[in-house]
């Protein structure tokens, strides 16, 4: 299964459920608003090329991060296959139009990443109008959800991922927790 197909499949799923989830509650972090993978929304459980799909948008890159949604926008962590461009993509939930593709980090010597992983596996989260995205030792960033402006970046997390980044950041009070 090719990378582009997997991304389209993932986007197709998100698109099919985005309307229901967005109306019930924002799916703003890994495993949803409470971090438990549950929602009150009743998304479709079946879809095809034409059934229960509102739109499809190709997103080039290789990323295993889950999409998150808040305030009518879907946010995706993304990376090139070689890990030399790490970005945050914003898609309009209603139309599927890519609103922003924000380059956050451009490592010249990316750390090793196992071929079955990606450089963009951690899921971002959205809170209080800010999007937080973590790429492991390559960097962590905070972006303004309304403008796409990069509010801050950090590249000082010393860690050896062994197989590539995979730890999604979580908010706790006024802290950002990364592992």
Language-model segments: residues:
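Bacterial N-terminal signal peptides
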Residues: 8-19
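N-terminal secretory signal peptides that target proteins for export/translocation
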Residues: 1-5
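Noncatalytic, solvent-exposed loop/strand surfaces
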Residues: 21-179
């Amino acid at each position: 299964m090719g990378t582009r197909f997997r991304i389209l499949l993932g986007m197709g799923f998100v698109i099919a459920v985005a309307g229901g989830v967005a109306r019930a509650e924002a799916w703003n972090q890994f495993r949803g608003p409470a971090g438990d993978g549950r929602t009150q929304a009743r998304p479709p459980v079946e879809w095809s090329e034409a059934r229960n799909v509102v739109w499809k948008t190709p997103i080039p890159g290789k990323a295993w991060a889950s999409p998150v949604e808040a305030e009518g926008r879907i946010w995706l962590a993304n990376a090139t296959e070689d890990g030399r461009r790490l970005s945050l993509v914003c898609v309009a939930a209603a139309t599927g139009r890519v609103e922003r593709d924000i380059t956050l980090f451009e490592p010249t010597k990316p750390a090793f990443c196992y071929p079955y992983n990606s450089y963009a596996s951690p899921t971002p989260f959205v809170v209080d109008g800010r999007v937080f995205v973590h790429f492991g030792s390559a960097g962590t960033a905070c972006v303004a959800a309304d403008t796409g402006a990069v509010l801050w970046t950090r590249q000082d997390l010393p860690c050896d991922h062994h197989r590539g980044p995979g730890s999604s950041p979580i908010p706790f009070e006024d802290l950002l927790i990364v592992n």
